[in-house]
Amino acid sequence: EGFIVPVIYSLSSYGMTATILNSEIKETTENTITKITLLPYWGAASKEEDGYFVVPDGSGAIINFNNGRTANGYQQNIYDTDGLMNVTENAINTEKALMPIFGIKNGQKASLAVITGGESQCRLFSFVSNATVPYNYIYPQFTYRKSTTIKMLSKTWYPLDVTLKKTKKVSDVNFSLLYMPLKNDGDYVEMATAYRNY
């Protein structure tokens, strides 16, 4: 009971692709899905590890692991903000995310992720380690069904997001993400080259 969300994993010469088959999602209760997070801890790094994330903020930016800036993390819609999305989500944006990509550099290992399906319905999140979560991690979150959410008790220790309205229409685009492993000692230059050659 609950939800069935089919995900297909496939390997190619580029790397590994994870695809959510939206037409086969089943909702078996009165509760419905609004957003889907895909592989949130893929490439996560502990507090002891050295590295950075590359995010598509403008033409690209680097977020160093364990940098102490733990308040909101990085949150950005791919390409631009949807005018129908919540004002609270829009307020966190910095530059427009111009490319559907993000990168992970962890010690000697590096990978580039390319969002290959559902990019315009995707929001990218990145967080560095803190007292609550001892990991540095980055992930895409896709909007399966649009909704309106308000923040309640935002100036307290226990703020709540309350969903007021959800649309019946769901996304008919499969959400897909390609992880491309890079050569040893790959860095942000190698990530840019891999995306250019993709």
Which positions does each model-derived feature cover?
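Carbohydrate-recognition beta-sandwich/jelly-roll modules
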Residues: E1-Y198
